[in-house]
């Protein structure tokens, strides 16, 4: 039995249903009652954030979004930073997209730093101020995912990784405006 949750997120804004403000108000109430320590959102874009903040005056602690080298979401990360919202990346390794994971730029950096490609991507996110949520069933990969604090990517490295973004980089085309 739990007395409280550390963090509770609204998973999608679902704009077609247009009830995410009511859902946000319910999370605010749960936080006031001590059932939740922090509240946040997932897959919210600027318009969604603006709408809930304007309606309630409460800024989410976290906005969890799809972010990886093919879909870097620079504008959304900047909006989250403006509101002092922690950006959390889901599918930071592009759901294991082998084309993305084996990009030449990532391969070169992995060799340069004696790291694996996933570690390069995780470090790129961390240096952008983004918290990656990496999942793995393999204890070996779990340990590797944590072994990213003994090196720093240079600003040139970061720029090279930033340039991997694509207009069609989303995984499964899950657009928060229509999903």
Protein language model regions, located:
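Phosphate/pyrophosphate-binding loops at sites that engage ATP/ADP/AMP, CoA/4′-phosphopantetheine
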Residues: 1-3
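Beta/alpha (TIM)-barrel catalytic core signal, keyed to glycine-rich beta->alpha loops juxtaposed to Asp/Glu
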Residues: 12-179
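Acidic/hydrophobic-patterned starts of short beta strands in beta-sheet-rich repeat architectures
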Residues: 7-8
């Amino acid at each position: 039995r739990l007395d409280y949750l550390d963090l509770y997120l609204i998973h999608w804004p679902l704009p077609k249903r247009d009830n995410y403000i009511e859902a946000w108000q319910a999370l605010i109430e749960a936080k006031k009652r001590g059932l939740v320590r922090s509240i946040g959102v997932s897959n919210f874009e600027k318009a969604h954030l603006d709408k809930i903040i304007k309606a309630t005056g409460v800024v989410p602690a976290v906005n969890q979004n799809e972010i990886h080298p093919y879909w870097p979401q620079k504008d959304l990360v900047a909006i989250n930073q403006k509101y002092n919202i922690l950006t959390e990346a889901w599918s930071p390794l592009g759901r294991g997209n082998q084309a993305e994971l084996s990009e030449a730029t990532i391969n070169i950096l992995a060799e340069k730093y004696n790291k694996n490609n996933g570690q390069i991507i995780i470090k790129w996110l961390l240096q952008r101020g983004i918290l990656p949520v990496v999942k793995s069933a393999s204890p070996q990969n779990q340990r590797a995912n944590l072994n990213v604090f003994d090196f720093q990517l240079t600003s040139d490295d970061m720029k090279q990784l930033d340039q991997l973004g694509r207009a069609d980089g989303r995984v499964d085309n899950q657009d928060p405006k229509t999903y």
